């Protein structure tokens, strides 16, 4: 399902992904609030189209202004426990990891996913990018369905 929203001009490229963080303090009193604040806070989105007919609008948050784009919920790549991980099954993230230098850290704590939620696995990607887990977790890299799919 595609939604039209406004994003900063620097982000306004087809294929760009972002996690919607909600209203910023600079949004108060903005005439474009309804077009800008129409996504679900915490969800990851992918830009599918940049509206070429639209103009760049002034924005108190984005210094170069905002553009109209079409977005859809984006899937999330994440590490989940290997046991029971197969396409179509449900999984939760294994929990926080303090090892931020690990190549798997962005997949163990992916932006746009919460630890206390269950997600449906759409695809098994394969082995995680790390050689071994410093928390001794047996993990598999998967693609989680976008919320609302």
Swiss-Prot record:
It comes from the Archaea. This is UPF0179 protein rrnAC1064. InterPro entries: UPF0179. Belongs to the UPF0179 family. It holds the Pfam family UPF0179.
